[in-house]
Amino acid sequence: GMSFPLSVGASSLLFNGRPTPDSVSHILETYQPTVYYGVPTLFAALLHKWETDGAAPQVPLRCCTSAGEALPAEIGRKWRDLMGIDIIDGVGSTEMLHIFLSNRPGDVQYGTSGTAVPGYEVRLVDEDGAEVSTGVVGELLVRGGSAAADYWNQRDKTRRTFEGEWTRTGDKYERTAAGRFIYCGRTDDMFKVSGIWVSPFEIEQ
């Protein structure tokens, strides 16, 4: 992420302190960035701070991107109402070195992770590796040119994660009729109730 701004002649703001709501709010107000990347937890914390303070800083943001965990729809809507700009929620991984599933500027649907980014393919499979139908929860697999080859000196993990050109993300998703993907949880934290996958994440929401 640090090299992307440089590739288009932009500047990056580096902060070596702890990213608290106070410190990040100060940076936004002081340096007036036009693009802001954060995790949902920090977006929520900033909203809480500004609501408590009674005002948000005036920042010329033209793009806000969230990753690292699923963005709760309520946080996205509150941010848009307060700041006048959507949060572009996306999904990436260390293994893929890039965001491969994302909403788009002007085409944001909160509560979903959007659609596949150009250059990447995604599919959902069941426990036997068969593709699942629309509306059925399955594990997300992705392939694209940025994928890692393996885990250094971790043969067993490599075999579990990389299947030919496809990388298993460990994330459970549901695909809508419109082709958007809804996050349902991790494969290692979901459980079945009467044959149906249940996600702690969905229950919490």
Range-by-range predicted roles:
Residues 1-34, 49:
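Conserved AMP-binding/adenylation subdomain of ANL enzymes
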Residues 41-43, 71, 147:
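Alpha-helix capping/helix-boundary segments
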